[in-house]
Amino acid sequence: MMIDYLRIQKIIHWLMAIIIMLDLNVAQKFGGEMELLDRLESRVDHATAGMIVTFLFVLRIILRYRYGAPSLPQTMPLWQTYLAKLGHFGLYFLMGLLIVSGITAANFTNDPIVVFGLFNLSSEVDNLYMFELIRGIHEFATNAIIAL
């Protein structure tokens, strides 16, 4: 039985938390009065941070599946156990939703979003309706994670 999370699990946890908080700062600037080139650069920075978080998230899931998690205290009331598990599952679900909605939203714009200088998340399709719809889901997931 696992008593504590592995050191690598803790490192991934805090790296993800720090990158997500810094990335939220970048994302807050999208709605301002930025020049087009600055907005595109911010989107690339945001997407790059998102891809790093995606890698860490997948690694986190693999480690969780492989090594598990510490048991909750036996003295914890049943309702708290349920809420703790629900909150943890909700956080994982929302992180996955955030990743998928971010990548999908980028796919509905033809503005170049080249991550690591290697691949373009955007496409030839410029569908403002779908972009706004999926970006709304992305923003919802962001706000829900903040609320948790």
Regions found by a protein language model. Give the residues of each.
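Membrane-embedded alpha-helical bundles that constitute the cytochrome b-like, heme-associated redox core
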Residues: 1-148
